[in-house]
UniProtKB/Swiss-Prot annotation:
Family: Belongs to the UPF0178 family.
Name listed for the protein in its UniProt record: UPF0178 protein amb2838
Origin organism lineage: Bacteria, Pseudomonadati, Pseudomonadota, Alphaproteobacteria, Rhodospirillales
Pfam families membership: DUF188 (PF02639)
Source taxon at top rank: Bacteria
Length: 151
């Protein structure tokens, strides 16, 4: 059965995930390096990992299986999940796919290099109401896709 994993420390759409997961009866696991206040629901669990740059990512990549869904903005984690045949969705509602992940990794590496040499690159645009709406629609679609991967 499909499970949803949330890269939880900075995810702005946790409540939306809980709502969609509840509608479909899916288990949700939030992974982060600090306890978060979550709804009292037997289908929602929290895994707290030790502090470290990739501890939450490593745990999600270890647990995720084909047909599961990962909610993350982290491109390397998205790549690791795609390799395991999971589905990946960013909080802004844009999926990471096998076709898009290579470009996303290359852009990330380029931006890191530019920051290292002192070029100002700016950050992502602020999270907007339209992002939340797009996310809900995309997650609903992705749940149906996941059911086709693992019936």
């Amino acid at each position: 059965m499909t499970k949803i994993y949330i890269d939880g420390d900075a995810c702005p759409v946790k409540d939306e995930v809980f709502k969609v997961a509840g509608r479909y009866g899916l288990a949700v696991t939030v992974v982060g390096n600090a306890w978060l206040r979550l709804p009292q629901d037997p289908m929602i669990t929290m895994i707290v990992v030790p502090e470290g740059p990739d501890a939450a990512d490593d745990r999600i990549a270890e647990l995720i299986e084909p047909g599961d869904i990962c909610i993350t903005n982290d491109i390397p984690l998205g790549s690791r999940c795609l390799i395991k045949r999971a589905l990946v969705l960013r909080p802004n509602g844009k999926p990471m796919t096998e076709n898009s992940i290579g470009d996303a990794l290359a852009t990330r590496d380029l931006m890191n290099t530019l920051r290292e040499i002192g070029t100002m690159t700016g950050g992502p645009p602020p999270f907007a109401k339209a992002d939340r709406s797009r996310f809900l629609s995309a997650l609903d679609t992705m749940v149906h896709q996941a059911k086709r991967v693992v019936p």
